[in-house]
């Protein structure tokens, strides 16, 4: 019985700690995390950098070496796709516009040293099909055809890439080429003037998360091209091709996770194995970047990167959830009645009570943690005071209403604790009665 009491007390304590303890992802060992997720792990393959962010706000939920400069390899193509989607949105291009393949395009598609698909001189390729070819089989030829649709000056296009990176706040990113393959691999068919043909592009996990978050929110149609494990291009024509995704975290792929719907992989001798995953399920909208997994000499790295990435993503999903913090309507704060004009919902740590700050006729949620960029912040809602708004405290204590919301949102944990406590009391009561019966028998 003593052992039971000790064990049960420990369980209850752990349950309570699990409810109130904030997540500290930066202190988690990635190798152990991946092992515990059931994957075979070689510590030498550990990612050099990784990040997971809330795609609504830019709040960082997981980070490891996020500002280390790395070669993104073919992930660079996401910026080219971004510029094309922006040109379409601005009316400069159209999604069904056709690009006629040149002799040079066909020659580039036949270069074995870089990733490609079959491009045939004289064939008209719709921009939408070229986008699929760029994002899934990672075709360098298709990427350059898209870049040339914006400008035939390859150097000016790279200049546009760098300008857009600066505009988005990608402060540690520099492009030397449009596709992620160094220009010297193109056998003279591609060489942006003024850019080093032997140097790879440079970026960081943070910067790629900024780019992915922006393209996910601004141009969600891109995810329609990346959300399937198998993709067909030029379907119904003599040039139809079928491609299996390299993003093995997509549902239906080798390490598929429900909710993953993009975005791009990349690998090179300089940068090893990398990928960006986008996730959207149960209103959890996330961007994950994993860089520098394994070594180029072992091509299994294209699978291994997803074991680490999946373990990290699942860790975040276990510790965070999308919740309604404050519903639209009238609320009572310490006797002051105010009305919010909309419901406030967001991604928050499980088991953590969000604090609110009332200031300048707004309710601001206060959450710990960094953001991708300095101008990003936690969401807020406008309020209309029905009484005493000016007297509301700027730093309110945890209120009765907050606790009530918290209890509802953590009903299962509280049910376990309350139920367990009742069971514990019943066991003690039963033991007490048993002792009395034993004493009576001795008499």
Question: Model regions: which residues?
Answer:
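Glycine-centered small-residue hotspots that permit tight backbone geometry or close packing
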Residues: 91, 120-122, 408-412, 418, ...
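Active-site-adjacent loops and short helices of periplasmic peptidoglycan-processing enzymes
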Residues: 25-205, 216-219
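Domain-terminus/edge residues, biased toward the C-terminal soluble/receptor-binding domains
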Residues: 174, 187-417, 427-443
């Amino acid at each position: 019985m003593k052992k039971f009491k000790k064990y049960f007390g420990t369980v209850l304590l752990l349950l309570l700690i699990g409810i109130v303890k904030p997540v500290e992802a930066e202190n988690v060992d990635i190798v152990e995390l991946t092992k515990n997720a059931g994957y075979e792990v070689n510590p030498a393959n550990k990612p050099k950098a990784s990040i997971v962010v809330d795609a609504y706000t830019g709040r960082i939920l997981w980070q490891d070496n996020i500002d280390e400069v790395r070669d993104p390899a073919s992930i660079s193509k996401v910026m080219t796709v971004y510029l094309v989607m922006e040109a379409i949105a601005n009316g400069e291009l159209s999604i069904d516009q056709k690009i006629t393949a040149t002799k040079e395009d066909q020659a580039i598609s036949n270069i074995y040293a870089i990733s490609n698909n079959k491009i045939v001189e004289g064939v008209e390729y719709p921009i939408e099909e070229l986008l699929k070819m760029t994002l899934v089989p990672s075709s360098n030829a298709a990427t350059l055809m898209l870049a040339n649709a914006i400008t035939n000056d390859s150097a000016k296009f790279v200049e546009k890439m760098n300008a857009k990176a600066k505009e988005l706040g990608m402060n540690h990113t520099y492009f030397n080429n449009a596709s992620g393959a160094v220009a010297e691999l193109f056998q003279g068919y591609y060489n942006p003037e003024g850019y080093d043909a032997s140097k790879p592009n440079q970026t960081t996990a943070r910067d790629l998360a900024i780019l992915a978050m922006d393209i996910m929110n601004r141009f969600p149609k891109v995810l329609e091209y990346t959300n399937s494990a198998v993709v067909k291009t030029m379907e119904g024509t003599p040039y139809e091709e079928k491609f299996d995704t390299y993003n093995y975290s997509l549902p239906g792929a080798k390490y598929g996770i429900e909710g993953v719907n993009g975005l791009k992989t990349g690998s090179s001798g300089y940068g090893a194995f990398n990928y960006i995953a986008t996730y959207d399920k149960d209103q959890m909208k996330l961007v994950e970047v994993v860089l520098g997994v394994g070594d180029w000499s072992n091509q299994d790295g294209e699978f291994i990167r997803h074991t680490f990435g999946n373990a990290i993503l699942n860790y975040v999903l276990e510790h965070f959830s999308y919740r309604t913090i404050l519903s639209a309507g009238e609320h009572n704060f310490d006797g002051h009645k105010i009305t919010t004009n909309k419901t406030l919902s967001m991604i928050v740590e499980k088991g953590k009570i969000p604090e609110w700050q009332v200031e300048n006729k707004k309710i601001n949620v206060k959450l710990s943690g960094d953001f991708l960029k300095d101008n990003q912040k936690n969401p807020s809602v406008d309020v209309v005071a029905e009484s005493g708004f000016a007297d509301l405290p700027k730093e309110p204590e945890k209120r009765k209403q907050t606790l009530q919301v918290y209890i509802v949102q953590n009903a299962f944990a509280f049910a376990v604790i309350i139920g367990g406590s009742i069971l514990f009391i019943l066991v003690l009561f039963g033991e007490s009665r048993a002792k009395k019966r034993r004493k009576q028998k001795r008499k």
